[in-house]
Amino acid sequence: ETYQACKEESVLSVIDGAHGVGQIPLNLGDLSPDFFVSNCHKWLYTPRGCALLYVPKRNQHLLRTSFPTSHGYTSPADRGRGTHAGKTDFEMLFEFVATVDDTPYMCVPAALDFRKRICGGEDAIYKYLHTIAQEGGDVVAQIVGTDVMQEPGLSNPFQESDIRRCAMVNVRMPLAFKDDKEVNPHVPDPSSSPFSLLSMKDAKPVCEWMQSRLIMEYDTFAKFYPHGGWLWLRLSGQIYLEIEDFEWIGNIARILCERVGSGEWLQKSRI
């Protein structure tokens, strides 16, 4: 909707689709964005770092240089002269960029083959990712006694929610903040938290403490963050995950919330 609004007002826009490729169906021909970027190493199963930049022909002349400026740079005076053996200025600009390691890009065909031959193809992957993320998110919410981030008033969130129409899910934790100025009216009031309310100035150290415990004690990682008066946990579905994995992280999240509620996070030496 934001992109369409920009288009109607003749405003150029860049779509940051970092998690797009490999997670949700994309048809850039139909979407026709002014600029689109995404990462292949997040969901397409290539090594890091491997990103893509899509620029329709109508806008390719707007990109003057790569970063860093490298071998393929063409000066303004020479652009459009067709002196690159049939290649456009845009192609030359990104054909060879300094000391960038091209190995991850060379893995894209193998990644696509793996997805088709081993995983059953794009549609099968998308369906499983969406299903496991949303069912898993509901399981975690049940374990910690909260809910999942979604639009209010939905009778069938799994089918109707735009927020949840992906392979990622955000689960509200039972930890709340007493002085968050951006309280969300669509979630319970922070005063309903079963634990003592935290201060927003403590949000970052609390999140860092919980994430450090995940790494040091449980050999895993997930992102905790404050939003709308509450602490949230962002989780992702993947082809190698099952519901039992979400039950596992849900119980860990519950334990960590209890430990924060007891004040253990204040023991800085434990971090």
Show where each model-derived region lies.
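Pyridoxal 5′-phosphate
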Residues: 1-271
